[in-house]
Regions:
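Juxtamembrane helix-loop boundary signature in multi-pass membrane transporters
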Residues: 1-8, 114, 118-179, 183
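Hydrophobic alpha-helical transmembrane segments of multi-pass integral membrane proteins
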Residues: 2-6, 31-54, 69-70, 173-181, ...
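Hydrophobic alpha-helical transmembrane segments of multi-pass membrane transport proteins
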Residues: 9-16, 20, 69-91, 184, ...
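Structural motif at transmembrane-helix junctions in multi-pass transporters
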Residues: 30, 84-100, 197-201
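Hydrophobic/aromatic residues within transmembrane alpha-helices
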Residues: 34, 88, 115-117, 205
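Hydrophobic core positions of alpha-helical segments in small-molecule transporters
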Residues: 37, 100-101, 128-131, 208
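Membrane-interface helix termini and inter-helical loops of multi-pass transporters
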Residues: 54-65, 114-126, 190-201, 224
Length: 224
């Protein structure tokens, strides 16, 4: 039950995070600068928490050498996910910016569980999992249909119906982008989960992920 409450709390926080970071984008006029600000603050916070809990941020050289290369790319996937959401928000709005990545997360999570990627425990696909995924897809369809119905009513009193039709068509590009970023997010979760096992600390794993993401963003934001 406690894990369910934590999961729900994280889910509630995601739309707020996306909205806040989108406002940051308006302030900095750059999605990368917005992401870098978010990651930098997160890195500092996680460093303090990790120091309080583990009393060290050190990672052994042998550990770095003996682990697969992909264990360190979780932060890069997080950068793609966060920056992608910032780009999606003005095109899809709050609801679809949240639900489209969820579709990608479910698809990728089922693949990761079924094949045991990233050293994850294997959970074969069964009818319950498939039905659950179909219910989520049904919810996504209903949410998109509701927005289309609302847009159609607005077109009745608008002279810009051709422009709105063009915008609706372009939304599918962003929806697919949302699904892809969601798949990256699910991969990041699995990778960081294994990193947490290796480091024997979930907080330190989160810190490492954020630190790598911050460094990548800093390198890409030199010309911003």
């Amino acid at each position: 039950l406690f894990a369910v409450i934590i999961g729900l709390s994280i889910g509630i926080g995601l739309p707020m995070q996306t909205a806040i970071n989108s406002r940051l984008r308006n302030a900095f006029s750059s999605p990368l600068l917005s992401s870098m600000t978010s990651f930098t603050i997160g890195t500092i916070f996680l460093a303090l928490v990790a120091l309080l809990i583990t009393h060290s941020l050190e990672i052994g050289v042998d550990l770095i050498k003996n682990q697969p290369w992909w264990i360190w790319v979780g932060g890069l996937l997080g950068v793609i996910y966060l920056t992608g959401n910032i780009l999606l928000f003005p095109h899809l709005g709050g609801v679809q910016t949240v639900i489209m990545p969820i579709v990608g997360q479910i698809i990728m999570s089922m693949l990761i569980d079924n094949f045991g990627w990233f050293y994850s425990p294997t959970h074969a696909l069964n009818i319950i999992r498939i039905l659950g995924a179909l219910l989520v897809l049904l919810g996504v369809f209903l949410a998109i249909s509701a927005q289309k119905l609302f847009s159609a009513r607005k077109e009745i009193i608008s002279d810009n119906s051709l422009l709105q039709n063009s915008n609706r068509n372009s939304q599918w590009f962003w929806r697919i982008g949302g699904i892809v970023t969601g798949m990256f997010s699910a991969s990041q979760t699995a990778i960081n989960g294994h990193l947490g096992t290796v480091l024997n600390s979930a907080v330190k794993a989160a810190f490492v992920s954020f630190l790598i993401g911050s460094i990548a963003l800093l390198d890409n934001c030199r010309g911003c």
